[in-house]
Amino acid sequence: MAAGAASLAHAQTPAPEPAAPAAPAAPALSLAPVNAGASADELLRDADYALRLLDTGRYQDLWNDAAPFVKQRYNPQRFANDTRLSREAVGAIKSRGWAAVTRIIYSGAKDVPDGLYANVDYATTQASGKVVYEKISFRLENDGRWHLTGYLPRVAQGPIPGS
């Protein structure tokens, strides 16, 4: 992973993967019921749109629709620079397709506000033929829409929660 990709993971605070069962003092975390929040189709449309913006360098548009807590933590320039570096690390793309949609409810978590989050994972084939993975993360806000919380490309797919 390029240095820029690593810094974006900190800069945009993607919705973290659920951890193994924790001690009783840990924050509440659960997979959301299928009917909670918007449909998986809506999440896929939003994630596809976010990837189109990433692919065309429209980082300001991504910033404009980011979750409020992301905007409070990071200025637009840092967001754009980190996002650009992360996307550049992926390189030229031959194809990509979604691999998983996971919704997660966070309550009392240290780094993110309480709420419903979602990760959309993609398997991406680079022009070289190598497969990498891209995660687009969102938070369902009070306006009823999913707002971007992060973009995280990586070379290996971790476990998919609930599978």
Task: Mark where each language-model region is.
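Short, low-complexity N-terminal intrinsically disordered segments enriched in polar/charged residues
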Residues: A11-T56
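Exposed beta-sheet edge and beta->alpha loop/turn motif
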Residues: V101-S163
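Short solvent-exposed beta->alpha transition segments
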Residues: A38, L44-R45, Q60-G115
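Internal amphipathic alpha-helical segments of the cytochrome P450 catalytic fold
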Residues: Y59-Q60, R145
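N-terminal signal peptide c-region/cleavage motif recognized by signal peptidases
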Residues: G4-H10
